[in-house]
Structures are given as structure tokens and as C-alpha cells.
Amino acid sequence: MIEVKPSQAQGSVRAPPSKSYSHRALAVSLLCEAPSKIENISRARDVIATINAIKSFGAKLSDNLTEIKIEPPQRPSIPDDVIDCGGSGTTIRFFAPISTLTEGGYTVLTGNDSLRRRPMGPIIDAINKLGGWAISSRMNGLPPLIVRGGGLKGGEVEIDGSISSQFFSGLMIASTRFERGLKIKPIGELVSRPYLEMTKEVLRRSGSHVELNEEIKVEPVPPKGLEFKIPGDYGLAAFHMLTASVTGGKVIVEDLDSTVPQADYAAIDVLRSFGVEVQEVGSRVIVEGRPKRGSKLNLKDSPDIFPIACVLASFVSEISEIRGVAHARVKESDRVANMASELKKVGVEVKELYDGLVIRGGSPKGGVKLDSHGDHRIFMALLALAAATREGCIIEGEDSVADSYPSFLEDSMKLGIDVRYNL
């Protein structure tokens, strides 16, 4: 655990590489017909799981820490061992359909305790409906998963869209190698749709063809090869923007690119909705000014911003309503319940709804112990909260930041946040 003393964030910081684009670029590069080169790739623990996965399927990597070159196999090979996805839902949901592309045999995909509680039913059902074979080893729709190889012809499939868009992205990538391509029809409301735009962008750059309308159509055009510099991650950089705001500081975040699709660009709109001053100057975002008013938000398409919105709402006396995130209950933790419990510890009025929170904030009290519940995004949000209290707070679970942003605490301290270790 760590102790965060009252602090004010000041200075500049480079945005970490996008975790979402790193996953997509690596998965697509495995299926390319020619070598790929990826620059500025994330070194987060979740992305390392994806790097290890493409190696297990036969990709050969050359890594000089600035760029990774990927030599793909002719087709994904049968892994020699179980694919350990760690805590990465993206990894297991992308590589379950990719596992159908091996010449034969079976692939077993599993992960840590958190991952083994995350639902996989939609991707299991989709693979089976398309003529493949996939099961949950415990027959409960949760990992471990067992997937048979041999290839899929493709065709049409319906998928429940209410849990995660990762199922759709995984099928979009894998289906570039299906014999007939694929048409996917979402059932119900499709959450996190902007992430599909990110998947489409990577596939487009590699030479594949995707249509995103009410239905998703993927042509059977294998990716040719990918050269891609991973942009900065708006969603992760937004935690420094949050800290700047609630501590009354000023932070400049560099190396962001709003010209490529980014689901978590929504963080900029969320900050502004609370009255925070945000300037965008080229590749820089400048944030200063405390939150001034409550906000009513629907974060259906950007659930990872939910903890940030909750902390902003905690520092304004007006009521805020943050909804549309029922699917945030099945992330690395139940983010709705866990954010509610932690905000109550610092005296914030919270009403929990099935799909979000109603929050009346003010001046959260410090001097308490907060728990990140092993969730990296909750931890980063709580650090901002703790720094903005008069007494500071102790926070458990700092190791979780390695999942997405290994240098988060180091970067926070460079901005002036007083973090104490060895408690």
C-alpha cells in the first residue's frame, strides 16, 4: 500500500502508449501476410500477455524497445502450452476466435482470478454458431476456454452487444482469415462502440476491409502487413488531467493524437462537462481549474472513464448522475459497486443504481484507507482523490497499475504528487 499526501499536480507529462491500439496492432500483425513494424508499443502487463500470445501462435518478434518487428506464421500454429492471458480481457476475447484458425488441435486460454470471473458466453456462442467448437472448461461461460482449430468458413452471426465490444473486435480481426468473411449483427444495445472504430482503423491500415453500420461486415481479405506508431492513450492520460483538476493544479499532457479514433477521447468532454478548463493545442492537452458544476453523463461507449467522472463529481456540491455503465460491473472489478464503497469512505453521498451512480460531492475527507480492489483504473482515480483531500489517504493495490500504465506513480510524482511507500 502507499500513502498519498495532500499535493497539487503541476507540470508536463507524456501520454503513455495506447493499450487498446497496442492489443489490436499485435493481434492483426499475427494474421498478416507480410512482416509488420509497430512503434511506441505499450509495455503494460496486459499488452505483454498479448505479445506472449502471438508468440505462442508462431509469430517471431524482434524488439529493440523502440519498435517491435513481427514476422507472422503462414497460419497461426497450435500453441505448445496454455495461453495465459493474465488479467487481460482483451487478450482472451481476441484470441479465442483467432484460436479457430490453427490447422487443428485445441487451444486453452485462461488467466488470473479476476479474468476467470469475466463472462465469455457471447464469444463461445458465436464460435459454435459459425461451425466451430468452443467451451468453457467449467461449463459456466467463464474462463478457462477450450477452442478447437481447423478454421471457420464465416457467414453471419448474432452476438449480445450488452457486455463488451471486445467480442466483436476479436471476431472482426479473426474473420479476415475466414473463407467467406463475416457479417455480425448485434443483439440489443451495443456498448463501447467507439472501440470498434479503433479495430477498423488498424485493419484498414493493414489492407483489410470492414464496414461498420448497424451490422458489421468484414471482407475475407487477409491483412497484408502493418506499420503503425501507437498513439498516446487519452483514457490513461486523463488520470493526470483529473489530478490536475481536483488538486487545483495545471498539467500539460503531450503526445496525444485526436486524428485517429480513440474511444476515451470522451474524457475531454467529461472534464469539460464538470466545468474544468481544457485546451487542445496540437498534440498537447492543457488542463487547469477545479470542477465547478455537476454533470449528467451516459458513459455507455466509454466505461473506462467512469472512475474519473466519479471523482470529479465528488468535488462539486451539485448532484451528478453517471449512468450507462452496467457493463463496468464485469471489468477487472465491479467498478460501480467499488467506486460507491470507496467514495462513501471519504464522506461523499452516493446512490448506487444498476448502471451507475448518483453522487453529491463537496469536500471529501481524507485520513482513511482506500482499496483499489485490484483494479488499475480505480487505483489511479483514488490517487487523484487522495491528493485533493486535506489529510491525504492510504491506498491499497498499487501493483495494479502495471496492467495498463506501469510508470503511473513515477509520472504522478514528477508532477508533484507526494507518494510515500514502505508502509
Curated annotation (Swiss-Prot):
Q: Does the keyword Nucleotide-binding apply?
A: no
Q: Which reaction does it catalyse?
A: 3-phosphoshikimate + phosphoenolpyruvate = 5-O-(1-carboxyvinyl)-3-phosphoshikimate + phosphate
Pfam families from the UniProt entry: EPSP_synthase
What pathway is this protein a component of? Metabolic intermediate biosynthesis; chorismate biosynthesis
Q: According to its UniProt record, where is this protein located? A: Cytoplasm
Q: Which domain of life is it from?
A: Archaea
Positions of 3-phosphoshikimate binding: 19-20, 24, 164-166, 192, 304, 331
Entry's Gene3D superfamilies?
Enolpyruvate transferase domain
Q: Which residues form a coiled coil?
A: none
> Which top-level enzyme class is recorded in the Swiss-Prot or TrEMBL entry?
transferase
What UniProt keywords are attached to this protein's entry? Answer: Amino-acid biosynthesis, Aromatic amino acid biosynthesis, Cytoplasm, Transferase
Self-association and partners: Monomer.
Q: Which NCBIfam families match?
A: aroA (TIGR01356)
Outline what the protein does. Catalyzes the transfer of the enolpyruvyl moiety of phosphoenolpyruvate (PEP) to the 5-hydroxyl of shikimate-3-phosphate (S3P) to produce enolpyruvyl shikimate-3-phosphate and inorganic phosphate.
Its name, as the record gives it, is: 3-phosphoshikimate 1-carboxyvinyltransferase
**Organism, scientific name:** Korarchaeum cryptofilum (strain OPF8)
